[in-house]
UniProtKB/Swiss-Prot annotation:
This is Biosynthetic arginine decarboxylase. It is an enzyme of class 4 (lyase). Its cofactor is Mg(2+); pyridoxal 5'-phosphate. One of its GO terms (biological process) is spermidine biosynthetic process. Substrate binds at residues 281-291. It comes from the Bacteria.
Length: 632
């Protein structure tokens, strides 16, 4: 593939921007993965890797996870803050605390811990805190405890502090402080506390409710003052060491981040005036990733990079400190999405394709109803040279005629054959109009979008949207989707992707298309009998954890892929995926009991013994098989 062709494909799918140097198109037109851009010779052809795994028995769909991407993301964020601190003369430390709610899988947590980079862990529930405490011995032991807390949660955190870890119990509700003080006295431990301030600043987009005065979490200004006095009266004011705020999970606009940090810096200044020695400044999450590759302020993009993010935070905090003669606090970010999103790709196979094929239409019978004649006359007019009617008018006339035919069919005025002929002719007319439209003509763009959606191939993909990409369904989030091969060809077709659940919501509605978003996906020409595998990229944050069991489709298989500079690749199975039996047990349906009931039914039939045994074996094999569709 020429460099010009490769450049065009990169622009079509915006790979150069959302791929972030981890994903690229190689000379074969295949997706290439480079888990560590600092070691460019360590890369793997993803299409070839998947096919090799399939030959060894790998089932699809499957998650292909690249732990080296996790580690590179962590290094990159740490490096950005190091540069920012050096640039602005900032004397405080920086610490990334990974919020495990983003992806609690052991492979993720341990890959980050073993990266060799400074790392803390954040918990938002008792279960998460137990996981964090168990792993705390492997890292520098900074632990941040967020979320609602009962007595057991608080005791666990204090036990961690008693064991020598730095555990910051962030006060989110005033009711928590009394329990903290009681249990700290019982355990004879000095608590290490933080306060989450509820800012007036608020971001925009899908996660804007995390910030602002109506936020679910955090203390208002009056409550912050009340907390300070409560701790002062208890002789524990020195325990309040961390200031925390959180604007949202995916902040698209750097201006919103800068505004929030400046406001929170005022809290830092005012708390010091009250005698509170705040030592840590936790700006929470918000560091977004560019799912679209548009570098914009849209909900699924960001208009900044790591360096600009770090610069804005360090400058704003440092400036407030310099103005008021205060020490530079340690800065903490809880950048879970930015660390994990890129490292996982869901790969699946297309199990069926419904394509709109175009044939040369034949004239209707001479005595055909008027609506059929009208449709045919419009078709003929479209092919006459010098016609003065617009493309839009042709399209509108044909749509009205087809509508009349559908109405007439319902009342018996048209036969099934006549309806089929009309629909096929209308399809050909749409195709003819589509060929003559000019994307550069602003007036044509709505028609282009309408026809692309109408004419797109329907691709039925072996996956559950609800299990593997729940945010695409729940909040209409966009993820990069494209074939793993065939990217050396011009994307002349359009497609929509449908999952295998029995739910009309199981469809992807938005796709990357150059610098914009479309309702259909650009596709290179392909063999409908042997369609390409598809990759769903950047699903490493939240998707595995939020996935649900709609239609009892379970977790997919997952493999960890390690790529080395000599070209060698090491693959480890990290999750075997759920069986049908696993999913049935989740809903209190015992597989053994079901097998017994099925066996009883089979025995009551008049089938011969061999057939009965065959049916029983097939049922039992299905119970312990994959929940997704499998090739025979």
């Amino acid at each position: 593939m020429s460099s010009q062709e490769a450049s065009k494909m990169l622009r079509t799918y915006n790979i150069a921007w959302w791929g972030n140097n981890y994903y690229d198109v190689n000379e074969l037109g295949h997706i290439s993965v480079c888990p560590d851009p600092d070691v460019p010779e360590a890369r793997v052809d993803l299409a070839k890797l998947v096919k090799a795994r399939e030959a060894q028995g790998q089932r699809l769909p499957a998650l292909f996870c690249f732990p080296q991407i996790l580690q590179h993301r962590l290094r990159s964020i740490n490096a950005a803050f190091k540069r920012a601190r050096e640039s602005y003369g900032y004397n405080g430390d920086y610490f990334l605390v990974y919020p495990i709610k983003v992806n609690q899988h052991r492979r993720v947590i341990e890959s980050l811990i073993h990266s060799g980079e400074p790392l803390g862990l954040e918990a938002g529930s008792k279960a998460e805190l137990m996981a964090v405490l168990a792993h705390a011995g492997m890292t520098r032991s900074v632990i941040v405890c967020n979320g609602y807390k009962d007595r057991e949660y608080i005791r666990l955190a204090l036990i961690g502090e008693k064991m020598g870890h730095k555990v910051y119990l962030v006060i989110e509700k005033m009711s928590e402080i009394a329990i903290v003080l009681e249990e700290a006295e019982r355990l004879n431990v000095v608590p290490r506390l933080g306060v989450r301030a509820r800012l007036a600043s608020q971001g925009s987009g899908k996660w804007q409710s995390s910030g602002g005065e109506k936020s679910k979490f955090g203390l208002a200004a009056t409550q912050v003052l009340q907390l300070v006095e409560t701790l002062r009266d208890a002789g524990r004011l020195d325990s309040l060491q961390l200031l925390h705020f959180h604007l949202g999970s995916q902040m698209a606009n750097i201006r919103d981040i800068a505004t929030g940090v400046r406001e929170s810096a005022r809290f830092y200044v005012e708390l010091h005036k009250l005698g509170v020695n705040i030592q840590c400044f936790d700006v929470g999450g918000g560091l977004g990733v560019d799912y679209e590759g548009t570098r914009s302020q849209s909900d699924c993009s960001v208009n900044y990079g790591l360096n600009e993010y770090a610069n804005n935070i360090i400058w704003a905090i440092g400036d407030a400190c310099e103005e008021h003669g205060l020490p530079h606090p340690m800065v903490i970010t809880e950048s879970g999405r930015a660390v994990t999103a890129h490292h996982t790709v869901l790969v699946s196979n297309i199990i069926g394709v419904e394509r709109n094929e175009y044939t040369d239409p034949t004239a209707p019978a001479e005595d055909a109803p008027r609506a059929l004649q009208n449709l045919w006359e419009t078709w003929q007019e479209m092919h006459k040279p010098g016609t003065r009617r617009s493309l839009r008018e042709w399209l509108h006339d044909s749509q009205m005629d087809l509508h009349d035919i559908h109405i007439g069919y319902s009342s018996g005025a048209f036969s099934l054959q006549e309806r089929a002929w009309a629909e096929q002719l209308y399809l050909s007319m749409c195709h003819e109009v589509q060929k003559q439209l000019d994307p550069q003509n602003r007036a044509h763009r709505p028609i282009i979008d309408e026809l692309q959606e109408r004419m797109a191939d329907k691709m039925y993909v072996n996956f559950s949207l609800f299990q593997s990409m729940p945010d695409a369904w729940g909040i209409d989030q966009l993820f990069p989707v494209l074939p793993l091969e065939g990217l050396d060809q011009v994307p002349e077709r359009r497609a929509v992707l449908l999952d295998i659940t029995c739910d009309s919501d199981g469809a992807i509605d938005h796709y990357i298309d150059g610098d914009g978003i479309a309702t259909t996906m650009p596709m290179p020409e392909y063999d409908p009998e042997n369609p390409p595998m598809l990759g769903f990229f950047m699903v490493g944050a939240y998707q595995e954890i939020l996935g649900n069991m709609h239609n009892l489709f379970g977790d997919t298989e997952a493999v960890d892929v390690f790529v080395f500079p000599d070209g060698s690749v090491e693959v480890e199975l990290s999750d075997e995926g759920d069986t049908v039996a696993d999913m049935l047990q989740y809903v209190q349906l015992d597989p053994k009991t079901l097998l017994t009931h099925f066996r009883d039914q089979v025995k009551q039939t008049d089938l011969d013994d061999a057939l009965q045994q065959q049916f029983l074996e097939e049922f039992e094999a299905g119970l312990y098989g994959y929940t997704y569709l499998e090739d025979e």
